[in-house]
Each structure stands twice: as structure tokens, then as C-alpha cells.
Amino acid sequence: MTPDIDRQVALETATELLPTQADLEAWVGAVLARHPDTDRHELSVRFVTADESQALNRDYRGKDKPTNVLSFPFEAPPGLPLALLGDLAICHAVVVDEAAEQGKPLAHHYAHMVIHGTLHLLGYDHIDDREAEEMEALERELLAHFAIGDPYAE
């Protein structure tokens, strides 16, 4: 299923470093291909500033700092089947800093963040060890499809 992605950019600089619409469709499409049972394929991906990320993280998670990706799954009212998956808010500054700190290409880290966030929209989590192992294994598999190495390797 081809994802329907509303790509939003809330940045005024460095927009040429952001993933393209085609990148997003490929990465999200790979996640959805592994989940053929879902008919939810519409989402928004918003590239945000550190200030917006911090405000969202504070308001929705109680953590007063910017973070790499926030996932907001859509929960349809009972009896109202919609194709909406949810929203991702990705902080460009944090992703750039993390990629540099981890010595990985920015595009690879963006792929990881989009795949990670999309898995959260589908209900995956990493609160306990078992869930984390399952989610991380799937992330590794999906990233390998794009010739991207293990993001959790030391």
C-alpha cells in the first residue's frame, strides 16, 4: 500500500537537508508493507524546530526538552473507519546532532527516525525489554532493505 504523507516543514533554514517526499514514501511504505493487515496509510510528517519539539515533548510526555521524533497515533472513534495512521514530529536539530555524535550519515538517521516513529504509530513500543527487542529487530530489518546498517550497533 502506498502511503499518503502530508510532509510539513516548520523550519526556515537547512530545508535542503530534509528527507524528500519520495524518501518518506519509501521508508513509510516499507513499514506498511510489513503490516499488510492495516488499512491505515495516511499520516503527516512535520519537521520541527527544537522549540516546537520541546513544547510538544513537555505538553504530551512531561519531558521539558526537545527530542528526535514524537509519534501521535490517530485513534478513530468506534465505528468510524478512517485511513489515518497519525502524526510524526521530527526535530531537525536533534536528528542532525545525533547523526554527528553517532558518526552516521544524516539520511540514514532520518530513515531510522521515520521508521521508528511509524512503528510507534502502528502500536509498537520499547517500554520493556521484550517490546524493545521486537521493535529494534524490525527496525534493523527495515533499514537493511535500504542498505542502512544496524542503528543500535556500538
UniProtKB/Swiss-Prot annotation:
Q: Which organism is it from?
A: Chromohalobacter salexigens (strain ATCC BAA-138 / DSM 3043 / CIP 106854 / NCIMB 13768 / 1H11)
EC class: hydrolase
Q: What would you give as a GO molecular function for this chain, any one?
A: RNA endonuclease activity
Q: What is this protein called?
A: Endoribonuclease YbeY
Q: Which Pfam families match?
A: YbeY
Residues annotated for Zn(2+) binding in this entry = H116, H120, H126
PROSITE patterns in the record: UPF0054
Question: What this chain does, per the record?
Answer: Single strand-specific metallo-endoribonuclease involved in late-stage 70S ribosome quality control and in maturation of the 3' terminus of the 16S rRNA.
**UniProt keyword terms in alphabetical order:** Cytoplasm, Endonuclease, Hydrolase, Metal-binding, Nuclease, Ribosome biogenesis, rRNA processing, Zinc
Q: Give the family from UniProt.
A: Belongs to the endoribonuclease YbeY family.
Essential cofactor(s): Zn(2+)
GO biological process terms, semicolon-separated: rRNA processing
Entry cofactor note text? Binds 1 zinc ion.
| UniProt cross-references to InterPro entries, sorted A to Z | MetalPrtase_cat_dom_sf_prd, YbeY, YbeY_CS
A GO cellular component annotated for this chain's UniProt record is: cytoplasm
Write down the EC number.
3.1.-.-
Compartments it resides in:
Cytoplasm
